[in-house]
Structure formats: structure tokens, C-alpha cells
């Protein structure tokens, strides 16, 4: 009887040990079906692409072009070539092409009046005002045409390979195109380079000329983690939305182009964000300054050994629960010779996940090591000589 109970207990133990890993695994469903012409989901910190479809297809940008307009304005302010409180004269041209008499989105600016740069930025970002975008373009570059050239130069600097700007508004123009991937790039740049102005994208209303207009980004009302960015719509482009949200310290950017309606672009964007936050994590796997290699041999130095570290955080975006499967491979220079300067690159950290290379990071000297005295150097030289002869 005792043997029978022992055998039964053993079977139960084996069954539990086999079943437990299945419960601990995170199941990831198929990618969500997105009803749009093109889309992409990226992590804003690491640039990791989580989902994409037709992300490099050139499509009309609609008002998403205004993201570059406000990015350049922010750059001009940061470079002190422009001030927030600078007064901008609203031209007849800005009023005619983008004002209240048009069918497009407008800030309802009055011609030949003056409005501050900061108010115009609010009008572009929140109200998607075409008149405000044209006024800013003319103020900075003299004409909207010249400003579009600045936009294209900036796009090239940022690596936006499939974008061509012809105006500051995104109003239809033959040959004016962008892509979902490029929109992810400019959104990342706005968040990274100008956080002081990014908060404008989260505002739900802005009032000018006693007219209070809502932000057209529906996700601002539906999801407290969403804090930007921009909507766009023309008959040619369809309904577009670049959105961003932050949860658990992780920021994602979703781009949806060519949806069928205002509701659809919000719904499809929410699908992307929800999928990304549920099934991915962005974490610092190695903090800056962490010692990753101890006792690296230093020849001809006043000290014999040196620690190697990393200069910046190693941040990765990986499927949730897969962090334990990360593999780190450390390669150190074959021969480290003094003098060594703190921060000098002396090796590489290779990180992979399930055989896929994720990142290569330089390993650097933790501190400086000067040359040793002449006799110590001679001693090391003799040891190295014999080592080479024997090998």
C-alpha cells in the first residue's frame, strides 16, 4: 500500500511539474485586424516596431503634416530665433487659404490682426487651424513655399525617407506624401526633443476669438493614458490619427492612415495601443554604470586589472514575460594597453532574444589607468613576448 501511495504521489508531482510551465507562459494572440490603408505601432523610447502594415507606402498626409510645422516652430524657439510671445501678423493669404470662409479646419483668425506664436501653436495642434499654420510658416520663412522647403530639409535630417512636403497645412497638393513609418519618426521627435510643447497635444479645448473648439482626437476622452498627438482628414487621405499613450513607464506611438471614419480611426488606434501595452514591455535591462566585466587585464598599466561598464542605460522592448530569455554575450579587446582613459571603448555587449540579435552596446573603461613605471612595463613586455612565442 505504501509503495502504491508513493507511486501515486510521484505521478502527481510529475504532472504538476509538467503543467506549471504552461500556466506561466504568456499566450500572445494573432495581430489585430486593422481597418485602414496603413499603420504602425512603435515604442517611443527604443524605436522598436511592434506591428506594421504598409508602413512605407506613400500616402497623403492631410493635417498630419502640421506635426512637422509645429516641430519646426519648436526648433526655432529652442534656438532663440523665435519667441513664444512674438506677435505674428495674420496675412490676407493665410485668411483666404485657411480661414473661416474655407471648408477646412480653422482657428478663425481675423486678417491683419496679430496673434502670439504660442497661441498659434495651440491653434495648429488643438484646432488643426490651417490659417494658423500658414501664418506661422509665413512669419518664419517669408512664404509657405519657402517653409515647405524647411520642412523637407528637416524630414531628411530625421530620416523620413518617404515624405515630401508642399505646404504647411497638409491641404491636398499633387505629390505631397508621407508614410506611417515617417509619421512615427516625427511623432517620436516631437515627444523627445520638445516635451515642453508636447503637453499642448493633450489639451482637449482651445478658445480664440470667443470660439471654443475641441481637440478632434477622440482618444483623449476615452483613455486617460493617451496624451497626443494629431488627427488628419481629407477625402483623398481618409481619416488619419497619430496617437501616443504612456502606461507603466512605457510610451507607445500608433499611426493609422486611411481609415473610413472619425470613429474608425480612433477605434483602430485603440486596438494597436491596447495590443502593445498588453503583450510588450519596455525595460532598462542594464542601467548606465553597471559593471558588466570585472578584472579585465591591463598591460603596461599602473594597475593590473580594470572593470568595464556601459555609459548609457540599455533599454529594450520585448514580449512580456520574455526578459528571462535574454542572452548577454560580452566580448573584450584581446589586448588592453595603458594608458586607458575612463569611458574608452574596450569591448562589446551583445544582447539577443531567442537567437535574434537585439542590440550591440560598447563596453567602456570604468576609470583611467596611466602607464606604469619603466621596469613594470619591461616586465609586461617580456611576459607578452613569451606568451606569443609559446602560443
Task: Give residue spans per PLM region.
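Bacterial N-terminal signal peptides that target proteins for export
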Residues: 1-9
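Bacterial N-terminal signal peptides
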Residues: 8-17
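Domain-terminus/edge residues, biased toward the C-terminal soluble/receptor-binding domains
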Residues: 160-164, 172-391
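Active-site-adjacent loops and short helices of periplasmic peptidoglycan-processing enzymes
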Residues: 22-181, 188-192, 209
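Structural motif marking the loop-to-transmembrane transition
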Residues: 2-3, 61, 113, 117, ...
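Hydrophobic alpha-helical segments, especially transmembrane helices
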Residues: 4-5, 67, 247
Amino acid at each position: 500500500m505504501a509503495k502504491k501511495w508513493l507511486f501515486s504521489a510521484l505521478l502527481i508531482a510529475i504532472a504538476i511539474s509538467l503543467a506549471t510551465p504552461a500556466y506561466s507562459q504568456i499566450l500572445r494572440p494573432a495581430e489585430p485586424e486593422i481597418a485602414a490603408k496603413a499603420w504602425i505601432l512603435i515604442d517611443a523610447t527604443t524605436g522598436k516596431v511592434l506591428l506594421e502594415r504598409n508602413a512605407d507606402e506613400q500616402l497623403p498626409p492631410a493635417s498630419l503634416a502640421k506635426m512637422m510645422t509645429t516641430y519646426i516652430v519648436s526648433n526655432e524657439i529652442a534656438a532663440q530665433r523665435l519667441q513664444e510671445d512674438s506677435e505674428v501678423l495674420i496675412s490676407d493669404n493665410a485668411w483666404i487659404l485657411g480661414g473661416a470662409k474655407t471648408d477646412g479646419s480653422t482657428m478663425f483668425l481675423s486678417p491683419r490682426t496679430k496673434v502670439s506664436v504660442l497661441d498659434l501653436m495651440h491653434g495648429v495642434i488643438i484646432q488643426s487651424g490651417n490659417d494658423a499654420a500658414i501664418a506661422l510658416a509665413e512669419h518664419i520663412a517669408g512664404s509657405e513655399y519657402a517653409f515647405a522647403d524647411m520642412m523637407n530639409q528637416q524630414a531628411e535630417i530625421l530620416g523620413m525617407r518617404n515624405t515630401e512636403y508642399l505646404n504647411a497645412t497638409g491641404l491636398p497638393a499633387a505629390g505631397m506624401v508621407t508614410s506611417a513609418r515617417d509619421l512615427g519618426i516625427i511623432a517620436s521627435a516631437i515627444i523627445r526633443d520638445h516635451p515642453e510643447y508636447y503637453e499642448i497635444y493633450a489639451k482637449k479645448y482651445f478658445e480664440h476669438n470667443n470660439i471654443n473648439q475641441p481637440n478632434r482626437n477622440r482618444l483623449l476622452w476615452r483613455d486617460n493614458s493617451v496624451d497626443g498627438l494629431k488627427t488628419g482628414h481629407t477625402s483623398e487621405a481618409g481619416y488619419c490619427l497619430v496617437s501616443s499613450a504612456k502606461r507603466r513607464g512605457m510610451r507607445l506611438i500608433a499611426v493609422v492612415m486611411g481609415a473610413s471614419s472619425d470613429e474608425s480611426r480612433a477605434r483602430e488606434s485603440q486596438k494597436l495601443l491596447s495590443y502593445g501595452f498588453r503583450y510588450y514591455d519596455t525595460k532598462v535591462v542594464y542601467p548606465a554604470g553597471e559593471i558588466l566585466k570585472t578584472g579585465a587585464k591591463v598591460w603596461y598599466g599602473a594597475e593590473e586589472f580594470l572593470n568595464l561598464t556601459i555609459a548609457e542605460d540599455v533599454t529594450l522592448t520585448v514580449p512580456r514575460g520574455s526578459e528571462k530569455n535574454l542572452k548577454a554575450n560580452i566580448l573584450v579587446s584581446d589586448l588592453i594597453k595603458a594608458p586607458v582613459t575612463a569611458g574608452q571603448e574596450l569591448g562589446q555587449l551583445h544582447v539577443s532574444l531567442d537567437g535574434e540579435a537585439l542590440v550591440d552596446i560598447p563596453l567602456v573603461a570604468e576609470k583611467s589607468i596611466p602607464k606604469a613605471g619603466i621596469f613594470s612595463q619591461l616586465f609586461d613586455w617580456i611576459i607578452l613576448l613569451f606568451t606569443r612565442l609559446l602560443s
